[in-house]
């Protein structure tokens, strides 16, 4: 009989992109879900049209992962792209006060025109070749506040949203720990290994005041040519708390491993 344990920790995750072996991992997940569905069709007959046989098919493995921290890698996985370093333009906004000389000084060099909004809500665009912008005295005078908007050039890490690109396939592993209910000590490590998964491209980002954004991504596991989808693996801890790692001179006699792997195809 297998050992009964208690699991109350979240699962860490590790994903390896199969196209280039890039590893993406998180040890600050809030929720790691493994869900399995099986289609069941019932053969009925006899008086009362009772169930006589069950036909099981279409085993599906899927789940969701919610992370505590925002991570661009999660977004790249959803979009099916890589993180790129690019020079882009973004909008900058400032609240500035007109100086004695009838100017405002910007924090950054604008790319082109600068939009000014005065205290009455009126708005104009002015040319700016430097950080110092001259304000027409008919628009605002000394001491008046202005809302200033302008574009600047910055270096950025970008994740492209492309209608023709979708998530790639990954090796995916969930890792949690099992506790011995008698001693409350760690008994073993539990791994859920899925050699080929595809992450969902669905995304929902809501930014709310006072609430941290916690990204969530869904996945669907795929079977290999032999029908295998993955496996559960228990790695028992030794008396000193270390894992039972197999060294090269010991040999295993088994092809199973808790190391990062590729597909079995």
UniProtKB/Swiss-Prot annotation:
Region (Disordered): 238-265
Biased composition (Polar residues): 249-265
Superkingdom to which the source organism belongs: Bacteria
UniProt protein name: SPbeta prophage-derived uncharacterized protein YomU
Organism ancestry: Bacteria, Bacillati, Bacillota, Bacilli, Bacillales
């Amino acid at each position: 009989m297998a050992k009964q344990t208690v699991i109350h920790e979240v699962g860490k995750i590790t994903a390896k992109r199969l196209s280039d072996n890039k590893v993406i991992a998180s040890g600050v997940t809030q929720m790691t879900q493994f869900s399995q569905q099986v289609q069941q069709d019932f053969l009925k007959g006899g008086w009362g049209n009772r169930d006589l046989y069950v036909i099981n098919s279409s085993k599906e493995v899927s789940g969701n992962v919610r992370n505590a921290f925002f991570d661009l890698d999660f977004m790249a996985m959803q979009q099916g792209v890589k993180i790129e370093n690019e020079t882009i333009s973004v909008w900058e906004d400032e609240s500035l006060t007109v100086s004695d000389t009838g100017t405002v000084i910007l924090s950054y060099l604008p790319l082109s025109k600068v939009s000014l909004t005065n205290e009455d809500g009126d708005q104009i665009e002015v040319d700016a070749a430097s950080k110092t912008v001259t304000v027409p005295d008919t628009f605002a005078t000394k001491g008046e506040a202005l809302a200033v908007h302008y574009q600047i050039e910055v270096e950025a890490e970008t994740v492209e949203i492309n209608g023709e690109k979708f998530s790639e396939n990954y090796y995916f592993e969930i890792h949690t720990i099992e506790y011995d209910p008698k001693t409350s000590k760690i008994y073993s490590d539990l791994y859920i290994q899925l050699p080929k998964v595809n992450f969902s491209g669905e995304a929902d980002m809501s930014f709310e005041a006072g609430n941290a954004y916690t990204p969530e991504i869904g996945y669907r596991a795929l079977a290999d040519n032999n029908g295998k989808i993955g496996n559960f693996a228990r790695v028992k801890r030794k008396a000193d708390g270390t894992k039972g790692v197999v060294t090269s001179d010991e040999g295993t006699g088994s092809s199973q491993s808790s190391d990062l792997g590729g597909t079995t195809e």
